[in-house]
Amino acid sequence: MTILIIAPAGASLRYRLCKLFYRPAGHLLLIYFLTWSAGLLAQGLPDLDGYSLEVALLLEEYHAESDDLGSMLPSIFAYQDNASAEMLIDFERGLISISAGNVGELKRAAVEILLTQVDPAVIDARTAQDLGLVNAKTQKPFLHAQVVDQDGSPIASAWRAGRYVDQLMARQAVSSPARLVIPMIVQHKAVASNKYLGFAKTASAKHMIPVALIMAIIETESSFNPLARSRSNALGLMQIKADTAGRDYFSVINGYSHTPTSAYLYDPANNVEVGTGYLSILADRYLAGIYHPQKLEYAIISSFNGGTGNLFKSLVPSGGRQAAIDRVNAMTVEEFYWFLTNRHIRVETMNYVRKVTALMAKYG
């Protein structure tokens, strides 16, 4: 099986392809998650005309190195349909890539991905037979307005999708075996974020967590991929681990012991509710005693990614909670932010704090 992977020319790339079998209403999806290097995450649309050689090199590299290990980036969603066409959505870079055995199959698959409703909130209503139809619940494709045609119009009909695919295939000189790249608009994340803003506002009002923080975490964790799954089994928009944050949520917020299912956490409303509830648990329980609200927010962000234990170990060698909190309270806001972004024991968490705090300005 071949998966088409798109990267800018000259990008440093490491990735591992892992499988998760997910069967909504009897339809088998093959969901893949890839590891990309930091150099791959530059924003903006690529020069599509220069991709054929790059794609071939990347495919060759994948077959040679597919057993390499690496941390997952959950912003990739891909599946293989019943006719063996392979479709991949990169929610971070805003690219859709499709691979098929011939031109006719490629066009069918491209039209399908532009029109299908793959939102997990309604995915259980889809079967293999109706894959490719606009879902009756929303009347709009999942990628509506994130992809526009050559007229700049959102794609919601088979006619418009087919015409746009024909134009792209001609531009990219598609031949057999057939591969096609469909770009999303530059502001695709802004369009995607609007789908989930209502959930964030509802959870914010319930748990007293800023909407900007919730949205910034969603973008950082999944790039608004509602079916995101990491190698460590963190799920959905906010990358919730069922047996840790999920269990804490049900125990503390709902008052009973329960581990949420994958299906539960793939539902966007549930995921945002559980994730936001867990942020409030961090604030009110694990990080209680940090008095300055801005320092508490920074501590919440770092702990959501790296855990409170690693935060405390970063602050004091013993990892003692009270000693760590006392040190936070003794710092200025600026000193604590500098510490988190320069002295935390996990480099990933240092970068995470920088990214989330920067994104909060966009949603504030």
Question: Predicted regions span which residues?
Answer:
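Cell-wall glycan-active module
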Residues: T2-P8, S12-Y22, H27-L28, Y32-E219, ...
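Active-site metal-coordination segments of metallo-dependent hydrolases
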Residues: H188-V191, S262-V272
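Amphipathic alpha-helical recognition patches that constitute DNA-binding helices
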Residues: L213, G236, A299
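Structural recognition of the beta-strand scaffold that forms the well-ordered cores
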Residues: A216, L237-Q239, S303
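Secretory-pathway/luminal and periplasmic proteins that interact with or process carbohydrate-rich
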Residues: S222-R231, R247, G306-P317
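Substrate-binding/active-site groove segments that recognize
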Residues: R231-H258, N270-I281, V328-M331, V356
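Short helix/strand-bridging catalytic loops that position acidic/His residues to coordinate divalent metals
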Residues: S257-Y264, G289
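Catalytic and binding regions of secreted/periplasmic enzymes and modules that target cell-wall glycans
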Residues: N271-G320
